[in-house]
From Swiss-Prot:
It comes from Archaeoglobus fulgidus (strain ATCC 49558 / DSM 4304 / JCM 9628 / NBRC 100126 / VC-16). It comes from the Archaea. Its EC number is 4.2.1.33. This is 3-isopropylmalate dehydratase large subunit 2. The keyword NADP does not apply. The gene is leuC2. Heterodimer of LeuC and LeuD. Belongs to the aconitase/IPM isomerase family. LeuC type 2 subfamily.
Length: 416
């Protein structure tokens, strides 16, 4: 019997013939932690008193509170740095960028097994890795031993057919899928993406979709690695890291989902759940106070390019705050070279240093009572951006940029 991508990777890393439902102990290739979760893992390691065997595969990031707005957070960041230096682990200081963007730019390879103390670790499936989030204690064990136990997930085959219409982007595709499945519709499943549209997507588009797999409960979201993946890695100077990762033709899936993307329209996720998805026509005209373009979901160069295309020569509506945050230092420099940063600033926007920015509600753009934000992030839970008395809509960078110009949630198609 053939295997899914999830079964193949977990079989290889556990040196076993594993199928969905099996429990395996697997060697982990890459481990990631951010400043909100790393202190918990480090303290757990200290409590265990165990030797750190996987320091060379462990990467610490300061991205959630970057730069730190409070003394307590500064102390945590110092604590992380000192531990990383002591054990010889990789440390990425404030300003380098978001954990998931840097992991894809520098470290994760197709076919890797990666874990992270962050729920959106599933992002790396966009380059053909099996990657998943874990709690800080489980990640501490991974750092100590270089391995951990996994239950091999059942897989849903998600067939994306057709071509994306004007004004419809990868973000719209994944929001539509989450709206159809519900927030728990794929709990502990691996979403494996196939079909004409998936094959034609750039890696940056795939990363957007993989990033949000967890929002319908999925353990992982995975695309096959192909020539697009090779080109993506080559642009990063990492072509040697490429390997082909594909499911077997006769792999068995728990469920098969078919989506004709040609029929899609721009969508948004309404407050206060990600699966509360509506077509743009249902919410168009809703006034917004803040627009946020960035995050590990949509802070890459192609995201900034489409936003800049809409904003160029236009102004942000009076009374609206536009915040743009590139996902990494590399993306920031690319945006500078292409003149995108100038476009955002001339339009009246604010461009912040690479990091998570307003997404987690620690600093940088906390909403006031009664305010509405449209954001390219991945979650819109009550209080997500620092105020439970505010509302968050999720959308593509194009929809967000169009809304910044209009001052209300707007259809991006009139600008494209």
């Amino acid at each position: 019997m053939g295997k899914t991508i999830a079964e193949k990777i977990l079989s290889e890393k556990s040196k076993s013939d594993a199928y969905a439902g099996d429990i395996v102990v697997a060697e982990i290739d890459q481990i990631a932690l951010q400043d909100g979760t790393a202190p918990l893992a480090i303290r757990q390691l200290m409590e265990l008193g165990t030797e750190v065997r996987a320091a060379d595969r462990t990467h610490f990031f300061v991205d959630h509170a970057a730069p730190s707005p409070r003394r307590e957070l500064s102390n945590d960041q110092k604590f992380i740095y000192e531990f990383a230096k002591k054990v010889g682990a990789d440390f990425n200081p404030p300003g380098e960028g978001i954990i998931h963007q840097i992991m894809v730019e520098r470290y994760v390879k197709p076919g890797d097994l990666a874990v992270g103390a962050d729920s959106h670790t599933c992002t790396y499936g966009g380059i053909g890795a099996f990657s998943t989030g874990m709690g800080s204690t489980d990640v501490a064990v991974a750092i100590a031993l270089g391995k951990n136990w996994f239950r091999v997930p059942e897989s849903f085959r998600v067939q994306l057919d057709g071509s994306l219409p004007k004004g419809v982007f990868a973000k719209d595709v994944i929001l539509k899928l989450i709206g159809d499945l519900g927030v728990d519709g794929a709990t502990y499943k691996a979403l494996e993406f196939h079909g004409e549209c998936a094959e034609n997507m750039t890696v940056e588009e795939r990363l957007t979709i993989a990033n949000m797999a967890v929002e319908c409960g999925a353990k992982a979201g995975i695309f096959e690695s192909d020539e697009n993946t090779r080109k993506f890695l080559a642009e990063l100077g990492r072509e040697g890291d490429f390997r082909e990762v594909k499911a077997d033709e006769d792999a068995e899936y728990e469920k098969e989902i078919y989506m004709d993307v040609s029929s899609l329209v721009p969508v948004v996720s309404k407050p206060h759940n990600v699966d509360n998805v509506a077509e743009i026509s249902e919410v168009e005209g809703t006034e917004v106070n803040q627009v946020y373009i960035g995050t590990c979901t949509n802070g890459r160069l192609s995201d900034l390019e489409v936003a800049a295309r809409i904003l160029k020569g236009r102004k942000v509506k009076e009374g609206v705050r536009l915040i743009v945050v590139p996902a990494s230092r590399r993306v920031y420099l690319q945006a500078l070279d292409k003149g995108l940063i100038r476009v955002f600033v001339e339009a009246g926007g604010m461009v912040l240093n690479p990091g998570c920015g307003p997404c987690v509600g620690i600093h940088q753009g906390i909403l006031a009572d009664g305010e509405v934000c449209i954001s390219t992030q991945n979650r819109n839970f009550k209080g997500r951006m620092g105020n439970p008395n505010a509302e968050i809509f999720l959308a593509s960078p194009a929809t967000a940029a169009a809304s910044a110009v209009k001052g209300y949630i707007a259809d991006p198609r009139e600008f494209l």
